């Protein structure tokens, strides 16, 4: 799969399948009788390719769209400074997320959760005709003033859902992501790659994952199938 690699195409595709099955590098190396460094090299290449693909997606979110922030830690991402939560007193990394009710997800590491920061992402990623669901965080104040006149809020201290207004979809994604990342012991290194991988994996069948990754690899200049 790597150009000039001595690994057979069959073995390379088996590595890809193990990756899509979410089998870790150690177990994959054992199952396929390969050096773990070889498997790690492939896994890192896959994650880099996936992250690039997800970040380059330009289609705006439309319809009913949920927005929310979550915090990952305890370590901060190297090179990023500034507030780490809605309030104060934590070094956790804030991540902003957008969830379209068809299952599509977008995530972005942010410096803080201020209105300026969140609105900039919302304006770039969500169509103004969309119906935005959020909680009551003040970072979402003023969305109507910047063209999003269909903004509905849920008070989570009282209800998880009210008259169809909820952010259960994006919260389910946060749960999926944190549960999955826990097996990597927090993935302080390459956190953004793992985050984008979760974004890519969410809600897809194994067949979809394999087909999509094979397509990404086939269209890449460094990797080939």
Language model regions located:
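Residue-level recognition of single "structural anchor" positions
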Residues: 1-225
């Amino acid at each position: 799969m790597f150009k000039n690699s001595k690994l057979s195409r069959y073995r390379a595709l088996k590595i890809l399948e193990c990756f899509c099955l979410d089998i870790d590098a150690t177990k994959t190396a054992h199952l396929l009788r390969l050096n773990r460094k070889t498997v790690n090299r492939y896994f890192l290449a896959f994650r880099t390719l996936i992250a690039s693909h997800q970040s380059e997606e330009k289609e705006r979110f439309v319809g009913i769209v949920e927005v929310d922030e979550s915090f990952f830690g305890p370590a901060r991402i190297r090179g990023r400074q500034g507030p780490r939560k809605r309030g104060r007193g934590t070094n956790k990394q804030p991540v902003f997320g957008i969830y379209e009710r068809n299952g599509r997800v977008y995530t972005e590491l942010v410096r803080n959760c201020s209105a300026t920061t969140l609105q900039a992402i919302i304006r770039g990623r969500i169509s103004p005709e969309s119906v935005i669901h959020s909680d009551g965080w003040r970072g979402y104040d003023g969305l109507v003033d910047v063209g999003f006149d269909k903004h509905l809020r849920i008070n989570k201290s009282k209800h998880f859902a009210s008259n169809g207004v909820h952010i259960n979809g994006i919260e389910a994604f946060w749960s999926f992501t944190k549960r999955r990342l826990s097996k990597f012991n927090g993935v302080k290194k390459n956190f953004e790659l793992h985050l984008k991988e979760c974004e890519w994996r969410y809600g897809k069948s194994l067949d979809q994952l394999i087909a999509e990754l094979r397509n990404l690899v086939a269209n890449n200049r460094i990797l080939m199938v």
